[in-house]
Every structure is written in C-alpha cells, then in structure tokens.
Amino acid sequence: MSKILVFGHQNPDSDAIGSSYAFAYLAREAYGLDTEAVALGEPNEETAFVLDYFGVAAPRVITSAKAEGAEQVILTDHNEFQQSVADIAEVEVYGVVDHHRVANFETANPLYMRLEPVGSASSIVYRMFKEHSVAVSKEIAGLMLSGLISDTLLLKSPTTHPTDKAIAPELAELAGVNLEEYGLAMLKAGTNLASKSAEELIDIDAKTFELNGNNVRVAQVNTVDIAEVLERQAEIEAAIEKAIADNGYSDFVLMITDIINSNSEILAIGSNMDKVEAAFNFVLENNHAFLAGAVSRKKQVVPQLTESFNA
C-alpha cells in the first residue's frame, strides 16, 4: 500500500501547514497509517516564521498526488476540490479534518470526516491527540497553536469558538511560549507586504468559491496599515484583472484586514459588483469600501457572498 499524503489547501497558511503536519503524525501514532505531510505551495512569511521558531523543516511541495505514487490522500483545513491538489478527483480521499463549509465535494467510497465549526483545523486535531492519549511534542504543539492563532487572529475573530479559548493556553504551555507575545509576533511576521509584488500579494491567501455558477476568488491580506496597501491600488487592480483573465474568475474580492483594529477594506473587481455590494450593504467607491469589524473570510465574507449570489 502506498503512502497516504496529508495536506492542507492551495496557498497554504499556518493552519493548513500545522494541521496537516500534526494530523500526519497523529495518524501514524494512533492509527498506524503510513502518512506524510506535504504542502500545495510554499509557506508564506507568517508560516515561515512559525517553522523557523519551532525548528521544523517546511513540508515538501507537491503539484500532483498521483505523480508522488499516492493512491489515497487526507485533507486538512479544506474539502472543496477546487482548493485542493490538481488531481484530487483521480485519487481516493481517505479522510477529511476541516472547519469550513462543505461544497464541491464527493467521493466514491465511504471516508472518515471530522468537521467542526471551530476556529481552526488545528483545534480539532489537538482534541484528537487528547482523545487518543498521544503525547504532543513542543514542535507539534507550536504548529497547532500557530494554526489556531492565525485563523482566529489571536482569538479575536468571530470564528473563535469557546473551546478555542480553552485550548490555546494549553497549547501555549506545551509549546513553551507566552500566548499573547508569541501570537502578536507571529501575526506581525505575516504583515510584511512591501516586499511582495502585486501578483504575490493577491495570492498570499486566496481561495476560489463556486457561487451559483460563478468562480469567485476571495483573497485576504493582513496588515497593520490599510492605507499603505491602498497606496498600491493601481498595481493591485492590474494584477487582479490579469488573474481574472488568466483563470476565468467572474469576480475577485480582496480583503485588506487590519489585524490591530479588526476591520477590513474590501477591494473588488468583476462582473457581479451589484451582488458584492448587496452582500455587504455598502457602495464601492473607486472599487473599494470599508467593512467595519470584518476579519474572517469564512464567517463574514463567504456566507454573505453566497447568499447574495444565490438570491
């Protein structure tokens, strides 16, 4: 039997990397599976900070599961096929551990699925470690903690579940870090956007959603200064227009999120701007508008877009 590959979504963030790494280890220890954690892209700057801090080598990057000789895969932090490995339909999905909506997903065989409406996939994996009484090393605790911090913006996001607030201190203790100090340093490491090209910036954390027959790309960048990002609006818009033309997106929505004040500016271009405006009850001026209190793509952007596009 070939090795089972475990990976998060394309354009991996700290939760995609952390949850896949941790679950691959858990699957070996608790279930006796022959697993390897891989990634569908290079770590972003935030995740690179995490890996360096805990002395963990970045997982190798793959573009095809079958090319690796894999017949089975386990997905963490995603389930939608368009967010997964390119040949996902050609291999067996052995299992899924996720905290997102379920869409564009079907399998030929029964599978293991663990889906919970919590702040991160890493939160789920950590509880599975406890359920199976598997010891958590400092490194794995650090990766899971980082995934939780990243996805909940240090427990400030509305996606944060009460259980996330309970396990974060546990993981911080296991990882040997101060939760607040480490969390802020980690998040700030991911806000260095000046060195990024516009093309890189709009692809740091981007996912495609199928909304009523439309392929809508929703990207998010974290910053401590929204105005600084908007100074690059012309080049960002040019990059978005090219991405739309090259990939057949109907619309592109970019969340520029202020991690300090917990607000976002929405920059949007595409064929359905009336639906985008209706989703958030605002008017785009020069292609952008302020969205107070919005920090979560999963809870404060995608559901609203879905409802509007389906109206």
UniProtKB/Swiss-Prot annotation:
One of its GO terms (molecular function) is inorganic diphosphate phosphatase activity. The keyword Hydrolase applies. It catalyses: diphosphate + H2O = 2 phosphate + H(+). SUPFAM superfamilies: DHH phosphoesterases. Mn(2+) 2 binds at D15, D77, H99, D151. It comes from the Bacteria. It comes from Streptococcus gordonii (strain Challis / ATCC 35105 / BCRC 15272 / CH1 / DL1 / V288). Its cofactor is Mn(2+). Its main location: cytoplasm. Binds 2 manganese ions per subunit. The keyword Acetylation does not apply. It is found in: Cytoplasm. InterPro entries: DDH_dom, DHH_sf, DHHA2, DHHA2_dom_sf, Mn-dep_inorganic_PyrPase, Oligoribo/pAp-PDE_c-di-AMP_PDE. It is an enzyme of class 3 (hydrolase). Keywords: Cytoplasm, Hydrolase, Manganese, Metal-binding. Mn(2+) 1 binds at H9, D13, D77. GO terms for cellular component: cytoplasm. Belongs to the PPase class C family. This is Probable manganese-dependent inorganic pyrophosphatase. Disulfide bonds: none annotated.
